[in-house]
Amino acid sequence: MPSHNWFSSLTLLSRLSFQVVLALFLVIVIAPARAAPVSLEGTVTVDTSACFADAVIIYNLASYLVGNYVIHAAAIPVGADIGRYGQKVTRRDNWRWNLWLNTISLFLPFFALSRTLILLAQQVRSDGDGVLAALLHGALLVVVRAPDWQPSTRDEVVYTRLPTKFAQQDDTPYGASLPEATIVLDAEGEEHAYQPTTADDHLLHGIASPPPGYTLATPVRKGYAEFLIKKHINDTKRLKVHYRPGFIVTLLSLAQMVIGTVSLYVSQTTQIPRWGYAAYGLSVTPYVIMSIMNLLCGVFVDSYTCAQLLRTPILEESVRRGHTNTEYDGTIGTVKEEYLPQNWGTEPRRSRGDYVAVRMRTEDRKKSDGSKDSETILVVTLDGKSREYRLVCAGSGCEAAGAEGTAKPVEFAVSAFSHDGPPPKDTVRRLEAITPRERTTIISLFLLAMILPHVVVYALTGYRPNHSTVAQRAWMMAWLAADQFSACSTLGCWILWKKKHNVIPDGVQRAWYAGLMVAGMGGFVTLAQMYLQDQGYQFQTC
């Protein structure tokens, strides 16, 4: 019990919102500023020693960085995500991913631009359907068949892709040497459809304990799950899915917008005459723009602290197995009556594509060699004719199948995700296609956000260098360029995933963004140097 409490405490600590911690930090750091009559910018006026003056300048620099930059990084939406990263939203260890997002956004604010716009577009796409929004944002789990799935010991209707020439095979009499067969999941028909997981890996609303042969999974390619929701589940538009209101994100975004706008306004008289278009106050512009986007996200996009388990035909099938440890509680959605397992039909019928409904069951029999060992027999019935096979598992580590001198086991393919076979690929592509509303939302806001920083710089400075050095101008412009390039990279990766479902390795992506962050780090160093020069910092040794 103590170890369980310790684990629970760690889990609680890991889930503490970074926004809450930052809000408390701001109270602690900024509140004492009332006791120091020193403006955020301009010349520091103190009547004490130079050491105290320098300390106040450093304090003001820290406050300037927190108010204009750090708040934005803390306010990015982390209760929802896009593409294949949606599976990280409700994981117990998602704080690592969130910390990585916060770190990139600190140095490259526009890194989160495409991500935020896509989240807004997905919310528009869901059209008020809470279940669909939870799916698109990464807060939905489903039950799927596992690789070791087998039919029940009693006859049940199973939709399968039959082996080649199945209809031409003769019935196999009991006692004869049985051919071998395996049951495999249709990996080709459900490519990138889901990622297996466990209840221990996620913060889950309710209880999910599937029986052997089944596992929890996070939908990866959302088209498969969206098809299932629209075809097999009763109307979900009236179903309310709990989500976390974005109060803290909204408040922090508003705070950063106010502080950043004031800093930008003050820079016209205190910085631009000296530094020209390299003025460090201008670097706040992308952060203010992103705070506006974060504000929209906080107001309109659902944010989730735990996963929801969707009730599907496969989940209903797992319940019918009657395993003692099977338990589900807190599920959402109801399966349409005609898609419940007990209503899959008394007579086999054709399903989608090349899948056929047959009757299947397994039996344990003693081996015919006289030993006491038993073997699993698969009985497949189609059109009133039954065929028997010795069931062997597929993959490495299984009992030898198709050994020398024996025929290769025949394969019965089943869908892991959908009980009656994978949906047509054209249908999945249509559901995953970028809709006109998504395209309009993303393109219009993306172009506006990308152009606006240059408009602001030109309007305030005319791109005049004034007294700034070449190095200062180079670092500040490289920072802006790397920032905007990170936005294009994020958008490009998402489009590549939507179109081709190619996965760029995490290591490559992290290295790429780490390289871009070098420009951001150089920009912060240049910013700090210019700020200290403006404040008359004397570099005193106290």
Go through the PLM ranges and name each one:
Residues 2-542:
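Alpha-helical transmembrane segments of secretory-pathway, organelle, and plasma-membrane proteins
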